[in-house]
A protein has these predicted regions:
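Alpha-helical transmembrane cores and adjacent cytosolic helix/loop segments
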Residues: 109-126, 130
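Acidic, glycine-rich active-site loops and adjacent beta-strand->loop/helix elements
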Residues: 17, 45-46, 128-130, 155-162
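Short acidic, glycine/serine/threonine-rich loops at helix termini
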Residues: 24, 64-66, 163-169
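Glycine-rich nucleotide/cofactor/substrate-binding loop typically near the N-terminus or early
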Residues: 30-115, 174-184
Length: 184
């Protein structure tokens, strides 16, 4: 994520090299209050055996932050109800909790549709891992702290064709310009 520009109620994110949860969260830390606030909030989430590292990084001549979560052995495969329980039991604000739960519910509904299973049978692989829970929770924590701006993702440099996204069970291809507005 490069050239994130925050204008009061709108956050513009130029994703010329792509975006991932850890990249988005690192950029929010970089343009906002920093990592100590976030670390204090993470202590409110009942997850164990993980460590967060925020460090300066430079790639392709562009300075930024890197956000890494390392976790010991643990639950990499969780059901939606497991994640809802973790978030519900956290000490995060009700607003942040509901948005995190909404995001995971949307992910579960998408997985259920792809696999033809009921939502309560969906088990997350990648997004059930500790790092994904922390990435999503961290983004919502920081966005709340920033006053819930509208987030506009775009790529000023390229018009993409045949973008491919892959996960453990699925892959998607889509075409068009890379511009999306995100309301959570």
């Amino acid at each position: 994520l490069d050239s994130s520009i925050y204008h009061g109620n709108v956050l513009y994110a130029d994703c010329f090299a792509g975006i991932a949860g850890d990249m988005f969260l690192a950029s929010l830390i970089d343009i906002s209050v920093g990592e100590e606030y976030l670390r204090n909030q993470f202590r409110k989430i009942p997850l164990e055996n993980y460590e967060v590292k925020v460090s300066a990084d430079k790639r392709g001549g562009i300075r930024g932050l890197r956000f890494d979560v390392s976790s010991g052995k643990g639950h990499g495969h969780r059901h939606l109800q497991d994640i809802i329980m973790i978030i519900t039991q956290s000490g995060l604000s009700d607003n942040v909790k509901s948005r995190i739960i909404n995001i995971f519910t949307l992910l579960a509904e998408a997985e259920a549709k792809v696999h033809g299973d009921p939502v309560d049978h969906v088990h997350f692989h990648e997004v059930g891992a500790v790092d994904s829970v922390i990435d999503i929770a961290g983004a919502m924590i920081m966005l709340e702290h920033m006053g819930w701006p509208e987030v506009v993702f775009f790529s000023a440099q390229y018009r993409f064709r045949n973008i491919k996204m892959r996960a453990r069970h699925t892959s998607c291809t889509f075409s068009g310009s890379m511009r999306a507005s995100f309301r959570y």
